[in-house]
Amino acid sequence: MAEQSYELMHKDDVVASLQLDDLSGAILKVTPGANPELLPLGGSQGADSLRKWWLRRAVPISQGNIAALLQQEGIPSTQSLLVRNLGLSLSDHYWIKPNGSELTWKDVSLFSNSFRDPLESMQIQHPHGAASTSTQTPAYSPSASLQGDLIKKWLIVDDTRCLLKGNRGANSQQSLNEVLASMLHEKQGFANHVHYLPVKLTGSASEQYGCICEDFASETLEFIPAIDVVDSEKKDNAVSTYEHFIHVCTAHGLSELEVRSFLEYQILTDFVLTNTDRHLNNFGVLRDSRTLNFVRMAPIFDSGNSMFWDAPRLPERSNCTEITVNSFRKTETELLKLVTDRSRVHMDLLPGRNEIAELYAKDDSIAFVDSILTGYEKKKVLLEHFMEKGIPAQTGHKRNIEPER
């Protein structure tokens, strides 16, 4: 088994020495460095946790065209792709440096250097500025560490790092759902969210809308996903993952009120949007990369898997009071029980049926729009019942079935 030696870096500070498998890109051996406090939070509990963090860092092979790219380029695994791109990311400041290399963070940072994304199959029209190109582009790509299953890519638009997202399937609903979530948060007056804009995709078999947003990490701020926050400290078996996350956040400088307020608002708005995929990689915190203190909760992002986006979840095919989710609890109603302040969402400021219909009208291939909108209205009624009564409405409660006319 051939091995290669690297140093795990945080900007220009050595974090650990690594031996990587030359073929698979997996971590074989870890030798801690002199700065253990710089270890990635999700890989700070020993060598095995760092191996898992590295594996999670690699782009999922299920994402978009990644499997085809690996086959085309003869790359054996997503971890190998990560190694070829020095483990670089547009979410944080970790990277790997080959032993003996004189590379510095200034040389490789994707926040300040140009890059070319290998996934050229998804292009956009540029109403908000032109994507830059460079004849002197380094070989490093942020695609190797880009998370999630949907096809997506990083672009540089007017010197700003932007993420372009596509859809699963033949219509634009998931991307337009991101735009809808932005609309909802803006109407609520909630500033800490990612602002998604709709963009026309070109070069695909069927013309669709994607969505684009600016990177919320930077040269000074790192995104730490909730899974890494949770994994950074051993959890007592008597403590829920939800409370453990809050505890770790407060230990790193955030106030308990700030964290709870954010999580409860997110739970309530995810409920009305029927966002079923708020797993621990889909929210987190922003960290000051110099002090390592948490600065604030990361803005709400990734709400595409909402609004009954998959047909089996259409309201007439599922119980709107017991929709299962990938989150802190197994169902939406169980998540609502975590909310202590029901006033965090203003019912009168939620988007109306006509506003959503106008947004979905951008793509006439979106099916079941009337059913989706009826489901949304049902969820508003359920949420209003929760706001008034303090308990989730139960199946059979007459007012939870038909929206007001």
Predicted regions and their residues:
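Glycine-rich phosphate-binding P-loop
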Residues: N275-T276
